[in-house]
């Protein structure tokens, strides 16, 4: 099958690799190179780099919503368009441009976690199960019919990186299976029940509210690392918690109270045991190294 691929980040790489191995990728669309590093040199997206390695034509339009880009896509010989974390809204003229339309890999149990940050919200909200869906795109926000889906259980204390890698690889396999069987698949409309939206994360969401349970704070730590990170303020400095564990135990302390010399912190319910931290503009340290340079005294109430 001839395929146009649209994608940008590392999450999309396994699928493009599978498509290159099993089909003919006739064009790749990705985000424009962005300034990166201290020298602000332009860096190509992971998808851009992979396409160049395989001599696939690459296009980096600033928008899909103009006649020039739409005409270009119409001229590219392809049966289908595959879109994964591209970064642009795909207009109807492109959704309808090819025989089999546009397919999208979405890493959640649709209609739960429609939107920009399904992986992060799955962990932040403490979901015990999730899915990868192959969806035929329409003009709505992740509202298209489901062609194929695979459910799975989340392991205890799954990290964002672990979930990202699992869904990226599972999605690639699922998409290839979808293309093999596409003429025989009966699309399934999404349920009108259980709709939630995985809104894009903000930096402000990372600020810890110690009134929350230790469990929910731990979920945020695992779901917001590396960005925006979960943090608290101490001595006018921002300190990110990179790793922690939670204890479901009763206590009588004010939430935010440091209750041990090893930086165990009382929460609205339960206790958070901090394992790894990073003070702004400094390197990440495990708790023992951190406390050698920064004293946070027992009985301190963190804000």
From Swiss-Prot:
It comes from the Bacteria. Keywords: Protein biosynthesis, Transferase. GO terms for molecular function: methionyl-tRNA formyltransferase activity. (6S)-5,6,7,8-tetrahydrofolate binds at residues 108-111. It holds the Pfam family Formyl_trans_C. Gene3D superfamilies: 3.40.50.12230. It is an enzyme of class 2 (transferase). It catalyses: L-methionyl-tRNA(fMet) + (6R)-10-formyltetrahydrofolate = N-formyl-L-methionyl-tRNA(fMet) + (6S)-5,6,7,8-tetrahydrofolate + H(+). One of its GO terms (cellular component) is cytosol. Its EC number is 2.1.2.9. The keyword Protein biosynthesis applies. Belongs to the Fmt family. This is Methionyl-tRNA formyltransferase. It comes from Rickettsia canadensis (strain McKiel). The lineage of its organism: Bacteria, Pseudomonadati, Pseudomonadota, Alphaproteobacteria, Rickettsiales.
């Amino acid at each position: 099958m001839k395929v146009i691929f649209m994608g940008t980040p590392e999450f999309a790489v396994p699928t493009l690799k599978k498509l290159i191995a099993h089909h003919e990728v006739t064009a790749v669309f990705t985000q424009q190179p962005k300034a990166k590093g201290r020298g602000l040199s332009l860096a190509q997206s992971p998808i851009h780099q992979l396409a160049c390695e395989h001599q696939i034509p690459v296009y980096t339009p600033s928008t899909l919503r103009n006649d020039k880009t739409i005409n270009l896509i119409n001229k590219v010989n392809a049966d289908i368009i595959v879109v994964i974390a591209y970064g642009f809204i795909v207009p109807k003229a492109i959704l309808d441009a090819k025989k089999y339309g546009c397919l999208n890999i979405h890493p959640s149990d649709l209609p739960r976690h429609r939107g920009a940050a399904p992986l992060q919200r799955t962990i932040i909200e403490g979901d015990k199960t999730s899915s990868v869906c192959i969806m035929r795109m329409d003009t709505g926000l992740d509202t298209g019919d489901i062609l194929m889906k695979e459910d799975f259980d989340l392991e205890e204390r799954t990290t964002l990186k672990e979930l990202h890698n699992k869904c990226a690889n599972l999605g690639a396999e699922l998409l290839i299976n979808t293309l093999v069987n596409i003429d025989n698949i009966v699309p399934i409309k999404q349920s009108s029940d259980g709709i939630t939206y995985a809104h894009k994360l903000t930096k402000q969401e990372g600020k810890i509210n110690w009134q929350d349970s230790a469990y929910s704070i731990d979920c945020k730590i695992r779901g917001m690392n590396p960005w925006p990170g979960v943090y608290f303020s101490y001595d006018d400095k921002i300190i990110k918690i990179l790793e922690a564990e939670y204890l479901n135990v009763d206590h009588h302390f004010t939430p935010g109270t440091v209750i041990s010399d090893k930086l165990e912190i009382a929460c609205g319910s339960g206790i958070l045991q901090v394992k790894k931290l990073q003070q702004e503009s400094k390197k990440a340290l495990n708790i023992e190294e951190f406390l050698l340079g920064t004293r946070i005294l027992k009985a301190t109430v963190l804000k």
